[in-house]
Amino acid sequence: MSVLDEIIDGVRADLAERQAAVPLDKLKEQAAALPWPKDVVAALRAPGVQVIAEVKRSSPSKGALAAIADPAALARDYAAGGACMISVLTEQRRFAGSLADLAAVRAAVDTPLLRKDFVVSSYQLWEARVYGADAVLLIVAALSQDALVSLVERAESLGLTPLVEVHTEEEVERALDAGATVIGVNARDLKTLKVDRGTFARLAPLIPDDKIKIAESGVRGPHDLLAYASAGADAVLVGESLVIGRKPREAVADLVTAGAHPALRDRH
């Protein structure tokens, strides 16, 4: 069994517990009282290369990264540094995240939010709405094509922007067939956890220019952002290097400054 399969098994078990505790109708009732999600596509299409900063305590590849006792404070630092969107891990077992983290961040910032989890059910999309997300991660490798298409359509119907994650040529094709507008290329293979920063440069040419291309994993600083930019990235998602550093606001600001270089401003 791959690492991804193990994670999905845990996600399904935890999901079943939440579904038993909170009926779907209750989530729908709560969502109906909330404002419509923010326009994530517009934020990502702003001039230059945008920065998505992540609230991430742990990962399967590295284990514990940072305690992050106050995710709201970290999110405020990210927003002050200029992040165009904040990604919040909500998977419990391998990433030590929670929906409570998402709610805390939503209460702290006006920046668009991404719920980063292993979504396998439309119930999780309703959760994302209720807890304040504007976008949701959908991982192609974790879903059948029918499920992917269904979740993309349902997310959009709820006002959520699907960030559809790929790692191979076949997955790019599947993402496009599912109607994805925002496609994230993960340099990390979720089945082996190995990182290959060349993955983005290899797959980006397969993604049409009218789509938004996000480089995920492997961004250690401005030099990596610029490398991804040269390969066609519209945005980068950065987690580990921000949470293990001592100055997240400054680190985000450095990335944002690199992404705003005049040579990158007319890319959209």
Curated annotation (Swiss-Prot):
Q: What is its EC number?
A: 4.1.1.48
Which pathway is it part of?
Amino-acid biosynthesis; L-tryptophan biosynthesis; L-tryptophan from chorismate: step 4/5
Q: Name one GO biological process term.
A: L-tryptophan biosynthetic process
Q: Which GO terms describe its molecular function?
A: indole-3-glycerol-phosphate synthase activity; phosphoribosylanthranilate isomerase activity
Q: Which chemical reaction does it catalyze?
A: 1-(2-carboxyphenylamino)-1-deoxy-D-ribulose 5-phosphate + H(+) = (1S,2R)-1-C-(indol-3-yl)glycerol 3-phosphate + CO2 + H2O
Question: Keywords assigned by UniProt?
Answer: Amino-acid biosynthesis, Aromatic amino acid biosynthesis, Decarboxylase, Lyase, Tryptophan biosynthesis
Q: Does the keyword Lyase apply?
A: yes
The record, for InterPro entries, names: Aldolase_TIM (IPR013785), Indole-3-glycerol_P_synth (IPR045186), Indole-3-glycerol_P_synth_dom (IPR013798), Indole-3-GlycerolPSynthase_CS (IPR001468), RibuloseP-bd_barrel (IPR011060)
| Pfam family name, one | IGPS
Stated family: Belongs to the TrpC family.
Q: What is this protein called?
A: Indole-3-glycerol phosphate synthase
State the organism's lineage: Bacteria, Bacillati, Actinomycetota, Actinomycetes, Streptosporangiales
Name the gene: trpC
